[in-house]
Amino acid sequence: MTSHLVGLAVANLCFLAAGAGVGRALGLWRAPRDLPGALAPVYLVGVAASGIAATWALVAGLELARWQVIAGCAALAAVGLVPARRAGLALPPPPPRPPARVVIALQVAVGLIVVLLLADAAYRPLSEWDAWAMWTMKAKAITLLGGLDPGLFAGVPYHHLHLDYPLLLPSVEAIGFRFMGAIDTQVIHVQAALLMAALLVALPRLLADRVPVVVAWASVLLIGVAPSLVDQASAGLADAPLAVFFAMAAVCGWRWIADGRREMLVLSTLFAAAVLATKREGTPFVAALILVMVVAAGRGRRLAAVGAGAAALATAVPWQLWLHANGVDTSNGEIPYSKVVDPGYLAGRLGRIPTGAASLVWHALQPGAWLVIVPAAAVAVVLAARGGERRTAVFVAAVACLVLVSVVWAYWVGRPSLHYYLQHSARRVVTTPVVLLGAFLPVLCVAASRGRRGPPVEPPA
């Protein structure tokens, strides 16, 4: 087990190196002294960029051998060496004063949660059906069969295993298997747990100039101890990584709207592309985010937001072309696209809408799963809107609601019974909007506390 953990650590160091190169080009750090404070967002950038590149490499016929991964990560790391115009750091500077005792206590608590999360992941068996039959199965197939073998990834006997789902998570796990030198389906759970841990550490840095540090760390502690997230982060499923990438895409997109830094728009595009490469549900999620960004950006920057959305969607084209070339049913038999605009078909299923929506809201509000993240965020949205921070409040509420609407739409038009959907997916599909609300909770709390003492944050002209 120890050697496998070391191998996985080496693979993640490659991701970190890739992220360091891309992150430096985007202003996450400039000098070596800046890097330690930016490690968490840099790591997430590295996994996102490497995962997307790995998917493209598989489509191109590569097998993700160790030398190929090292070469690819080295190429991404070299991006940081390209001379670029320096306009300061994209990340807000850390607080100049030493943290107060309460902040240190919160940081220690978050650190303890991270350690426990990683330990739980390292010893957790491969017991989730979707992980065993879909996500880790595909990672094993990539490793054992030397890439995308059409006999499996386009094979009729495997059609019920969602062959059309994107490959970022299986690709990243396959890289982990390569560096382990073995297929350890237990240790590999650490990979998704690392992504969640990185999000918890990255959010306070991304919001350092917007919220008091104590509020930021208290909020991520609330996210980190949410029972449902702890369970999913080490289960080998794609829902937690999807939520991580989407939260980063939304936070970076909001920062671009508020501050006008193009680097944040590029980061939002990268993480949106990672969302698309992680799970099929990511497509409507990204569409919802881009729509809200286009509306919120204002006249002068709407074209940039549209361009960012188009760039993110373009990254998914190679995988879609591979599916089409190999005759894979991209609806997997669940979504009858020919019926989507059939009034008779839709009218006969209207009863699914209130039932599905109510079930999703019920799961999101469960204190035994998500504590008080959703109620706290809902109250903060209302108070922030009444206090003058309408732009931020509407941005967060609109993205979260549109994400839920996209899930309800899938429940409405999908062929499987509504009972099947609610029993097998409802508790997981709310992960993305709940983590989104948790990521913005410190911003909303600060906005709500201001009342009408200050003007709302307006984007630069």
Predicted features by range, described:
Residues 1-95, 446:
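Membrane-embedded, hydrophobic transmembrane alpha-helices
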Residues 33-41, 183-186, 203-225, 258:
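Transmembrane-helix signature of polytopic, membrane-embedded enzymes
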